Amino acid sequence: SAAAVLGGAGMYVDYAASKGAIDALTIGLGREVATDGIRVNAVRPGIIDTEIHAASGDPNRAFSAAGVVPMQRPGTAMECANAVAWLLSDEASYVTGTVVTVSGGR
C-alpha cells in the first residue's frame, strides 16, 4: 500500500509499518534470490475502490479521498490486477526487487 511511503494516519501507523516491511522484503529478497532465477516483486496500491470501504462503514470513501490523487479518481482492482499480470509476464522478465506503485500519481 502507498501507506508504506506516505505514512499512515495517526491510528494506522502499524499498518504503514507493515507495508514498509513488505517493501523491504521485496527489495532484499529480490536481490538475494535473483541468481537462482527467482523474481520477487510487489504491487503497492494507492486509493483503490473496493468493497473494503463499504465493510468499514463508508462505501464512498475511495471517491471522497480521491481529491489527493493527481488523476482525481480512485483506482480499480482491475488496474492493480493488470500490474500483477504484467509482473508475471515474460515482458517483465528483467524486473526483480521492485515495488510497482499503482496510485494515480500519488
Identify what each model region corresponds to.
Residues 1:
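Residue(s) in the substrate-gating loop at a strand-loop-helix junction
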Residues 73-102:
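C-terminal substrate-recognition "lid" of short-chain dehydrogenase/reductases
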Residues 5-12, 34:
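Active-site "substrate specificity/gating" loop of NAD(P)-dependent dehydrogenases
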Residues 35, 47-69, 79:
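A glycine/serine/threonine-rich, flexible loop-to-helix segment
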Residues 18:
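Active-site helix of classical SDR
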Residues 39-45, 49, 88, 101-103:
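Conserved SDR Rossmann-fold cofactor-binding beta-strand/turn motif
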Residues 31-35, 93:
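Alpha-helical segment proximal to the catalytic Tyr-Lys
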Residues 15, 23:
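Catalytic tyrosine of NAD(P)H-dependent dehydrogenase/reductases that use a Tyr as the general acid/base
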